[in-house]
Amino acid sequence: MATTANGNSKKRDGGLSSLAPRKINVQKFSEARAPELESLHSIVSERLNKDFRSKRNKRRRTNSYNNQPAKKRNIKRQKSQSLIGQVSGGDHEVKITRRVKRRMELKGNPETGFCTSGDGTKRLRTHVWHAKRFTMTKLWGFHLPLGLHGRGRGSRDVLKQSRQGVLVHDASYHIAVQLEGPEGSLLSILNMLLEPSPSSHSKEVFDSILTGGSYENAMLYHVEPPVSQAIAPVTYMWRPSKIPKRRNEEKGGDGIGTDLPVSDKDHEDFRKLWVWIHASSFSEGYAILKVACQKQMNETGVSVDCFSLEGQLAKLEIFGSKASHLLQKTLHPATSTSENPSILRKCSMEKAEVKNVADLYTEENVSSGAILAQFVIDPRLILTSPHDDRTVSVETIKTEPTESVETTTNTEAETFPEVFNCLWDANSELTPPEEENMLCWEKHQSRMDSLCLDDPAAEVPKVSSRPRSSRSCPLLLLKHKKLGNAPTGWSLILPLSWIKVFWNAFVSKGAHAIGQREKRWVSCDDGLPFFPSDFPDCKAYSSFTLSEAADLEEKAQRRPPAIRPFRIPIPPPWNSIHVTRSIGEGSNQKFSSNGRSVVEISSYGGNLFDGIVARTSDSLTTFLQTFTSDNMLLFPHNTSKPSTDLMMTLQEDDKKVRAQIHQSSNKLCLVRVLLHAFKEGSFEEGAVVCAPTLADISLLKSSCSEGEDGRVTIPQSSVSSYFQEQPCGTWELNVPEDTLTEQSHRWPIGFVTTGFVRGSKKPAAEAFCDAVLLGRLRDEQWRDKDVRRRKKQIYVLVRNLRSSAFRLALATIVLEQQDYCDVHCF
């Protein structure tokens, strides 16, 4: 080896070094090959006759060399950047355009709060992504994605994705309310407002909810009269906490299900509770929670804090057959290591660790309704190799020292509050993610180092004046309850500033984004209710349907009168069911001369629906007991009874239900049913469900009946006059007076709230029917029939409001098929 003046050693034989050159001099590289380039240029010039212009017959975009739109965009971009720099760096006030302001707002990622438009409507953090691909609409104070562009089709592809892929939905319009106070006071408030109440569950389920191991769904009601005016379906969850006096001291216990009953008040500790409410009913629900807290303080003298977490937490919903697989690819737990924060490093997880993370999200290892708590790495730093599944490459700079994976059912109470202070403590600052330009600069430096190249122009990018940022995110994973044919689903609760990071990661890994319309399709296909469309007893339903009716009326007025469709009632006239019930109670029912029933129908405040909806087996059973004169054959499903220690609380719930039922003898009690067409027919939203006669059933069941003789119809003139609009704007049932119309008239017992979905393998519509009338129909259809030939479904007639034909359908009462309650909203 010989040593040069610079001290570098080289090989004597003059061979090439195994190391790549530190720098490549492009000028010397081109000078060494100048003769080759000149000869190539001469050959090309001879072939083109020294005319290097493109031939006119070969030109396509003749002005492509002079790209004026691109130049204009570049000039505007430079002006915007200069204005943004002047605003951020200058001391004097600079007047900037609205476009620059809006771009700054939409590109920004503040720690808390939503961006708002000029009229105060809030935008989701994924607003820009959705606005480029979806039809946006203003709903409940938010700009929300309604659905893909077009006429509202595409349900087949969405249902296929739910069965074979994975869907993702930004549910940040759900807002959490946090309650803080003694455990006994919080339980009293929940028992006062929720149905089913926490204490009405079995001891095992109740202990799991109270310890924070699982969440629960319930209906939120008013605390003041009217006693049982429904507000909205909610999801509530407790902050996990270890209670020493309630723990079983045996060493072999797992700590779950060993709490003492609620009546044991030897130890009352300070607990925290989240109640998630839909945006359409948030103001009403938040107000009633504060009223309940004030009432609890007036009665007991114990203070309970209630405040909103709007703009702090976000929720993402993922469902589909491959939802667990998507979580395995995206969520990787942060390791408890500390490295130099200025150096980008690569770390790998062992095969066993990767297997443990992958098994965490499998359906067999996580129970339905469970809560998983994790600190995960920023998904932008995760690089997975598609060819090697033995290791997972992770690029990260610095991660907070946390446990790798934590499950609330196995979490020690001493570590869990410390890990998730940022989520559960409202006063704590939520750390936003690292900015995108910083991560891109670090990745660029990493690539340059791997190629052994120096970047002389490399400078640290400019970042916003944030005090701190993080590369790991705390989140809660909620496993959806398995109900019917619903696909596997998860809900992610995470800081609002992290929503765009995980949204882009899920979409880039194959998730199919959906809006409000697509989510309703999937909900109906799975047989689950969708809020607020399938909750007619809530004020949110009335306001939503009235706004839809106004939009449809505006579209109809744009059409010429000759082709303008006749008006139909939106929302459905639920009070018309009173007439059918009164007809069944006595054959001597008289009607006034103007066709209106003498049955008095009372108004119910601002709500268009006057009645109740039985959503639990207990409430339906209590309602059936008030009608002792009728032999109503309804069988609500009820699996487990609570322990005797909880009977006092159940008696309070029973009083609440009875007070609601006896408040007015004319109140309706509706139950949710699923309608399947017996032979043919497609049921639309708003279709009327009618009571058939035995002759109708035998006629429509006959396979040899064809033509008009084999159909049950009403006269074409009665289609538009079946419901009549009153001068005050309400709709009432038009009772027929002549004999011919009376023979074809069928009395309504309910209405369809969600129609058939195209592309469903087993189409079903969701409707609400009166429980009393369903019981009478079943009694009539089971009479004089052998027990083995009795169907559990009930035959009904369904007619779309613009059609004259009745279709035979089978109605399945959900409370007879589903365990315990019907409050699980999709």
UniProtKB/Swiss-Prot annotation:
Q: Which UniProt keywords apply?
A: Nucleus, rRNA processing, tRNA processing
Q: What happens when the gene is disrupted?
A: Accumulation of unprocessed cytosolic rRNA precursors, especially the large 35S rRNA precursor, as well as of the internal transcribed spacer 1 (ITS1) fragment corresponding to the region between the 18S and 5.8S rRNAs that contains the A3 cleavage sites.
- Is this entry keyworded Metal-binding? no
Record has tRNA processing as a keyword? yes
Principal localization reads: nucleus
Q: Which InterPro entries match?
A: Pop1 (IPR039182), POP1_C (IPR055079), Pop1_N (IPR009723), POPLD_dom (IPR012590)
Record-level Gene Ontology MF annotations:
ribonuclease P activity
GO BP: any one term = rRNA processing
Where is the motif (Nuclear localization signal)? Answer: 58-65
Places the protein is found: Nucleus; Nucleus, Nucleolus
Which stretches does UniProt call biased (Basic residues)? 70-79
For this record, an example GO cellular component is: nucleolar ribonuclease P complex
Q: What is the purpose of this protein?
A: Component of ribonuclease P, a ribonucleoprotein complex that generates mature tRNA molecules by cleaving their 5'-ends. Also a component of the MRP ribonuclease complex, which cleaves pre-rRNA sequences. Required for rRNA maturation, including 5.8S rRNA processing.
Subunit structure of this chain's protein: Component of nuclear RNase P and RNase MRP ribonucleoproteins. RNase P consists of a catalytic RNA moiety and different protein chains. Several subunits of RNase P are also part of the RNase MRP complex. RNase MRP consists of a catalytic RNA moiety and several protein subunits.
Task: Supply the name of the protein.
Answer: Ribonucleases P/MRP protein subunit POP1
Protein species of origin: Arabidopsis thaliana
Gene (UniProt) = POP1
